[in-house]
Amino acid sequence: MTRKAWIIGASTGIGAAVADELDSKGWNVVRSSRSKGEIRIDISNDESVFEAARKYQDQHGDFDLVLVMAGFWQRMSAKHFDLNVFKEHNNTNTVGLARCAAAVLPEMISKNRGTFVGVSSVAGFRGLPGSSGYGPSKAAQINFLESLRTDLVNTKVKVQTVSPGFVKTPMTDVNTFPMPFIISAERAAKIIVKGLYKEKNDIVFPIPMAISMKLARLVPSSIWPKLFKKG
């Protein structure tokens, strides 16, 4: 039986690359985004998400693999804090992921099968300069997915978290700051799909960035801000 994957946020970047990678491995891939795809979806809108989930079930049946890869990023520092930008990060990244979970997990739980995957970021591991909107939304995603995973540990429903470092995409092309260890979207897709096949709870990459950010968690909070002092 052909395996089915619904990729939400598949128009460009990592989502498009993951869709291509799964397609090359024989998966029946349904691509969704706000502007393109067989099923249009706007994860910042409740009605859009639940309607898209209904369309998917009508056209393709059960949810085998659902990957939520859509997201929002805008650099924002404390000196230029904008509450509306913070809310947009939260509504798209955090609540958007929760909307998708609410739309597909009940069916997965009912059938006791399926895999739900959320794409977060290593930016959620620790507070970073210019990330006062993006970082908190990604930290919330990581915690949310882990909470779901603990709730579903005695079922056959799997929840996986993807936390990339810098990946070359239209989203990162606008960045004017250094992006260490940056990799291509195609390379990222291969790592993600390999992690999906291995059923890893957390897929963190590239390795140098994963190690750096995991070590960063060990730095005392009294010292962490001082690492970013200039001069």
Where are these regions (language model features)?
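Substrate-binding pocket helix/loop in short-chain dehydrogenase/reductase
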Residues: 77-88
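Residue(s) in the substrate-gating loop at a strand-loop-helix junction
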Residues: 121
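Conserved NAD(P)H cofactor-binding loop of Rossmann-fold oxidoreductase domains
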Residues: 69-74
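Active-site helix of classical SDR
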Residues: 101, 137
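C-terminal helical subdomain
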Residues: 161, 177-213
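N-terminal Rossmann NAD(P)H-binding glycine-rich loop of SDR-like oxidoreductase domains
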Residues: 11, 19
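Rossmann-fold cofactor-recognition segment
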Residues: 34-47
